[in-house]
C-alpha cells in the first residue's frame, strides 16, 4: 500500500449531490473527463449538457485541461466505477464551501503523508486509525488537529500504529497549524494648536496605548509630526483591525476635548513583512535624523 496516495474521506465513492473538487484531464465530444482529487483521482465525467446553463459557444471558455473545478455528483455506479458530474448546477456558495473543505483536507493529507513516509506506514492506515475517526467525532480531522494544539483530550480513543507515530504527528501538527500573529497597522495625523497642544497630543496617544490588552499590545510611533503609526499584532486579523479602530476612536475623543484633530491617513489593515520592514527602516531613518539635529544644536550652543 502507498505511503503517499489515499482518498481523503472514509467513503470510497462520493454520494449523489456531494460537491467535489475535480481536475480536468481531457475534453471530448461528450464532455470533459475529470479526476476527483479528494477520492484518490478516480475518474468522472462532466457531460457537455452539464457544463453550463447557457448555450455553449466555446467549451474552452467554460473548462480547461489541467484546471481544478468544482462539480456536483449526479450519478455513481460503484460496480463499474462511473461517476457523472455537473458543473452548471454548482452555486457560488457551493464553490466557496468546497474550496474551503478541499484546502483543509489537503492540509490533513499533507500532515499524514509526512508521517507515513517517515515511518514507512501505508497512508491509508493513518487515515483509518487517526483521520477518519477524528472526522467522525469533530466533523473534519483538520478541526481536530487544530484543537489538539491546546487540548490533548482530542486524542482520547484514537489508536495510532505506535506511540512514536502519534508523538511525531503531534509535533508536526504544532509546527504546521499553530496560528501566526498578523501585524496590523494604521497611520494617523494628530495635531493640536491650543496652549496645551503638546501635552494634549501626548495624552491622546497614551490613551491609544492604554487600549492594549494582554493578547494585543497597541504601540504608537512618531514618523514625522503630525504623522503617527499605530501597530498591533493579533492571531485574528479582524480583531486586530477592530482593536486599532477603537484606539483611533480614543485618540479622536481625547484630542477633540483639547480642540485638536485626528485624521486617518491609512485605516487599520494587515501589513506584509516587506511593508513592516519598510516602516522600521523609515522610523530608524527619522530617529537618526533627530539625533543628528540634536547634535547640531549642541554644537551650535558650544560655539556660542
Swiss-Prot record:
GO cellular component: cytoplasm; cytoplasmic stress granule; cytosol; eukaryotic 48S preinitiation complex; eukaryotic translation initiation factor 2 complex; multi-eIF complex; ribosome
Ranges where the record places region Disordered: 283-304
Swiss-Prot/TrEMBL keywords: Cytoplasm, Initiation factor, Phosphoprotein, Protein biosynthesis, RNA-binding
A molecular function GO annotation: RNA binding
Acidic residues composition bias: residue spans: 294-304
All copies of domain S1 motif, residue ranges: 17-88
InterPro entries: NA-bd_OB-fold (IPR012340), S1_domain (IPR003029), S1_IF2_alpha (IPR044126), TIF2_asu_C (IPR024055), TIF2_asu_middle_sf (IPR024054), TIF_2_asu (IPR011488)
Phosphoserine carried by residues: 52, 292, 294
PROSITE patterns: S1
UniProt xrefs under Pfam families: EIF_2_alpha, S1
Intracellular or extracellular location(s): Cytoplasm, Cytosol
SUPFAM superfamilies: eIF-2-alpha, C-terminal domain (SSF110993), eIF2alpha middle domain-like (SSF116742), Nucleic acid-binding proteins (SSF50249)
Effect of residue 52 to D: Weakly impairs derepression of GCN4 expression in amino acid-starved cells
Free-text description of this protein's post-translational modifications in UniProt: Phosphorylated; phosphorylation on Ser-52 by the GCN2 protein kinase occurs in response to low amino acid, carbon, or purine availability. Phosphorylation inhibits the guanine nucleotide exchange factor activity of the eIF2B complex.
Compositionally biased spans, kind Basic and acidic residues: 284-293
GO biological process, one term: formation of translation preinitiation complex
Cited function: eIF-2 functions in the early steps of protein synthesis by forming a ternary complex with GTP and initiator tRNA. This complex binds to a 40S ribosomal subunit, followed by mRNA binding to form a 43S pre-initiation complex. Junction of the 60S ribosomal subunit to form the 80S initiation complex is preceded by hydrolysis of the GTP bound to eIF-2 and release of an eIF-2-GDP binary complex. In order for eIF-2 to recycle and catalyze another round of initiation, the GDP bound to eIF-2 must exchange with GTP by way of a reaction catalyzed by eIF2B.
More details: Present with 17100 molecules/cell in log phase SD medium.
Recorded family membership: Belongs to the eIF-2-alpha family.
Oligomeric and partner information: Eukaryotic translation initiation factor 2 eIF2 is a heterotrimeric complex composed of an alpha, a beta and a gamma subunit. The factors eIF-1, eIF-2, eIF-3, TIF5/eIF-5 and methionyl-tRNAi form a multifactor complex (MFC) that may bind to the 40S ribosome. Interacts with CDC123; the interaction is direct. Interacts with GCD1.
Protein name (Swiss-Prot/TrEMBL): Eukaryotic translation initiation factor 2 subunit alpha
Amino acid at each position: 500500500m502507498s505511503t503517499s496516495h489515499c482518498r481523503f474521506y472514509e467513503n470510497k465513492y462520493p454520494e449523489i449531490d456531494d460537491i467535489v473538487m475535480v481536475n480536468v484531464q481531457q475534453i471530448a465530444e461528450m464532455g470533459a473527463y475529470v479526476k476527483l482529487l479528494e477520492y484518490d483521482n478516480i475518474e468522472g465525467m462532466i457531460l457537455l449538457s452539464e457544463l453550463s446553463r447557457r448555450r455553449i459557444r466555446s467549451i474552452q471558455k467554460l473548462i480547461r485541461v489541467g484546471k481544478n473545478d468544482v462539480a456536483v455528483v449526479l450519478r455513481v455506479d460503484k460496480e463499474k466505477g462511473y461517476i457523472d458530474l455537473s458543473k452548471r448546477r454548482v452555486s457560488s456558495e457551493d464553490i466557496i464551501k468546497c474550496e474551503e473543505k478541499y484546502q483543509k483536507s489537503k492540509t490533513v493529507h499533507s500532515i499524514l503523508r509526512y508521517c507515513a513516509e517517515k515511518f514507512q506506514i501505508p497512508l491509508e492506515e493513518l487515515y483509518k486509525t487517526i483521520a477518519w475517526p477524528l472526522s467522525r467525532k469533530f466533523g473534519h480531522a483538520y478541526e481536530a488537529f487544530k484543537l489538539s494544539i491546546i487540548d490533548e483530550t482530542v486524542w482520547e480513543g484514537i489508536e495510532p500504529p505506535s506511540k512514536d507515530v502519534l508523538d511525531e504527528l503531534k509535533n508536526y501538527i504544532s509546527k504546521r497549524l499553530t496560528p501566526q500573529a498578523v501585524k496590523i497597522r494604521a497611520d494617523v495625523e494628530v495635531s493640536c494648536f491650543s496652549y496645551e497642544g503638546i501635552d494634549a497630543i501626548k495624552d491622546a496617544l497614551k490613551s491609544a496605548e492604554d487600549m492594549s490588552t494582554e493578547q494585543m499590545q497597541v504601540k504608537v510611533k512618531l514618523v514625522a509630526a503630525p504623522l503617527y503609526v499605530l501597530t498591533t499584532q493579533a492571531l485574528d486579523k479582524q480583531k486586530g483591525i477592530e482593536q486599532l479602530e477603537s484606539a483611533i476612536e480614543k485618540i479622536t475623543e481625547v484630542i477633540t476635548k483639547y480642540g485638536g484633530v485626528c485624521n486617518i491617513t491609512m485605516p487599520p489593515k494587515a501589513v506584509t513583512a516587506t511593508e513592516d520592514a519598510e516602516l522600521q527602516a523609515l522610523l530608524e531613518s527619522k530617529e537618526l535624523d533627530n539625533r543628528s539635529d540634536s547634535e547640531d544644536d549642541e554644537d551650535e550652543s558650544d560655539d556660542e
